[in-house]
Every structure is written in structure tokens, then in C-alpha cells.
């Protein structure tokens, strides 16, 4: 079995693949993971056992990380506690044409999502929108040319900034508001968060020009599922992209 990990700024998303099927998924807050390799190794083994994953069957480990200061400890933990050399996805491990951008600045999660989207929809121009800590937009042409896109604060990050910057405002649960015009502070905030982000999503898609097939992923993609912005929502896009990159590089002996 192949274990893949998407290490984001807010959450760690772990997937266990048996062939091309995800048989287990685990989510933890990134802040819950200690930074030493031993602590991380113990944490990972315990998390997998708690989710009934047979550690003896894991024979590969693929990682997408946008938390560089944890990469060394994570890699060391996998080697020591799983006896596996981990594969880290990067600009050097993909056949995406990234010549149009500063490739070294592109996050591993964005690369993984593009790889997965291309595999699912070959010969299409694609727009991948990842609604996580940040909301990112990535354009990829049908001939696998990565054009990048844009980045804006995510829904939760916007809420946190609002509450930290305005002393009389407190946090709210993030849900689609029942009405656009709020009747108290909480419903005002919910309305602003939802419709403000929705407006930014619509305008960004519009500004990217010619018709593209639009795929959403990330923790807040489902918040906008009733809107007509996306052609599809793919929660496992990054995990599947890590798997594809792992297998392709394994064939090359990387």
C-alpha cells in the first residue's frame, strides 16, 4: 500500500492507497504535530494504527508539503519509523511545463493538484481552485503548460484576520448564510465572508478568460457547492496527484 500526505499550513491530510483506491483518510491539525523526527514518527504510527491501517503493508510514502521547516523531520521520521525513503513532490518531479513561471516558488500542493486534474481530464484547458488556508487558482493548458494564476486569503484566514483586527468582532461558524442581509453581527460576518469570497471566485474565473474546465478542491470547496462556479469538486485531488507523481518517478528510479 502507498501512503500519501498533504502537509498544509493548517491541516495534514493523509491518504492510504491500495492500488488506485483510497482505503483510509486521516486529517489532523498541522499544529498538533511536533517538530522532532521521533515525535513525528511516533505520532504518525499511532495515527495510522488508530485508523486500522496495517503498517506492515505500507511500501511507499509520497509527500506534498508547504511547511518547509518540517520537511527534514518528516523525511527522517519516515525513514526511521517506516524504513522507507519518502518521495517529496516538487517542480523537479513532474513533467509539467513550468517554463512560464518562477517554478521554484510554486507550492507542492498546487503541482500535485494539477497532475491529478490533467490525469482526470486530458486534452482540456483546466482551472484548479484550491480553497484551503489560502484560495489558489492554477491554470493549466491542454498541452500541460502550467500558467499559474492567483492567490488570495482563504475563508478561514479572512475570518481570523477580521476578528483579530476588529476588537468588537468575534469568530463565527463558517456556513452558507440563510440570507444575504444579516440581522446581527454574526449573520453580517457570515454574509460578508460567503458572498465576498463568492464574488472573488466568480470574478477571478471570469478574468482568466476563455472557457476552461474548473475543478475545486480543499476544505472549503464544499461551502460553495450550490453555486455554479465549478464543473466539479474533487476533495482528494491533491492526494491522487501525489500518488501519480510517486508512481511516475518510481518508474524512472527517482
UniProtKB/Swiss-Prot annotation:
Its EC number is 2.7.1.33. Keywords: ATP-binding, Coenzyme A biosynthesis, Cytoplasm, Kinase, Metal-binding, Nucleotide-binding, Potassium, Transferase. One of its GO terms (cellular component) is cytoplasm. It is found in: Cytoplasm. Pfam families: Pan_kinase (PF03309). Its main location: cytoplasm. It comes from the Bacteria. ATP binds at residues 6-13, 133. The active site is at 109 (proton acceptor). InterPro entries: ATPase_NBD (IPR043129), Type_III_PanK (IPR004619). The keyword NADP does not apply. One of its GO terms (biological process) is coenzyme A biosynthetic process. Its cofactor is NH4(+); K(+). It catalyses: (R)-pantothenate + ATP = (R)-4'-phosphopantothenate + ADP + H(+). Homodimer. This is Type III pantothenate kinase 2.
Amino acid at each position: 500500500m502507498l501512503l500519501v500526505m498533504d502537509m498544509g499550513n493548517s491541516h495534514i491530510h493523509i491518504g492510504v492507497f491500495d492500488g488506485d483506491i483510497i482505503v483510509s483518510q486521516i486529517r489532523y491539525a498541522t499544529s498538533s504535530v511536533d517538530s522532532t523526527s521521533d515525535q513525528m514518527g511516533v505520532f504518525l504510527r499511532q495515527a495510522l494504527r488508530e485508523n486500522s491501517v496495517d503498517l506492515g503493508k505500507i511500501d511507499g510514502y509520497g509527500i506534498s508539503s508547504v511547511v518547509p521547516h518540517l520537511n527534514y523531520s518528516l523525511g527522517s521520521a519516515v525513514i526511521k519509523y517506516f524504513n522507507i525513503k519518502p518521495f517529496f513532490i516538487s517542480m523537479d518531479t513532474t513533467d509539467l511545463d513550468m517554463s512560464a513561471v518562477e517554478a521554484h516558488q510554486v507550492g507542492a500542493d498546487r503541482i500535485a493538484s494539477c497532475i491529478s486534474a490533467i490525469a482526470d481530464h486530458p486534452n482540456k484547458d483546466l482551472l484548479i481552485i484550491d480553497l484551503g488556508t489560502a484560495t489558489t487558482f492554477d491554470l493549466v493548458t491542454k498541452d500541460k503548460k502550467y500558467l499559474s494564476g492567483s492567490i488570495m486569503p482563504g475563508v478561514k484566514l479572512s475570518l481570523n484576520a477580521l476578528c483579530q483586527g476588529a476588537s468588537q468582532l468575534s469568530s463565527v461558524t463558517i456556513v452558507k448564510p440563510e440570507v444575504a442581509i444579516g440581522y446581527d453581527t454574526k449573520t453580517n460576518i457570515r454574509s460578508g465572508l460567503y458572498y465576498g469570497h463568492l464574488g472573488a471566485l466568480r470574478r477571478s474565473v471570469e478574468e482568466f478568460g476563455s472557457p476552461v474546465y474548473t475543478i475545486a478542491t480543499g476544505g472549503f470547496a464544499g461551502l460553495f457547492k450550490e453555486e455554479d462556479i465549478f464543473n466539479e469538486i474533487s476533495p482528494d485531488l491533491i492526494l491522487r496527484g501525489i500518488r501519480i507523481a510517486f508512481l511516475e518517478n518510481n518508474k524512472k528510479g527517482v
